[in-house]
């Protein structure tokens, strides 16, 4: 399956975005769910990953421009010292790539409370560069 990404400059960085809600959902189910499954295999005690895996399939998504300051990282995840250390290292590497013009995906945000579900490294770099608004795939409860 291929996806029809568009490349858009926004703020100081270039994003590779999907606009079609069905395509966004397919992309997230294929790639983000796989990433979370691997995370869960490595750290089954991390309850936030389980919660995200449970709600993702039932959500509908849209590409939105939102205020970066409105996004809330998961407090439990951010309290893990090893995660904080690795996040800073990954953010340093990602920052260099972004400054060299490498595009980034929109952040993945739960529209109910604006919890950051995916994109902690990108979020960290975007905060460093005081981006006011960012692209995000915002998820809301789907139709059951």
What are these regions (language model features)?
Residues 105, 123, 132:
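Glycine-centered loop/turn positions within well-structured domains
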Residues 102, 129-130:
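A structural signal for short coil/turn segments at secondary-structure junctions
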Residues 57-117:
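Short alpha-helix boundary/capping and kink motifs at helix termini
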Residues 113-129:
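A sequence-level detector for short glycine-anchored, His/Arg-bearing signature motifs
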Residues 2-62, 68-85, 132-144:
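Surface-exposed, charge/polar-rich loops and edge strands
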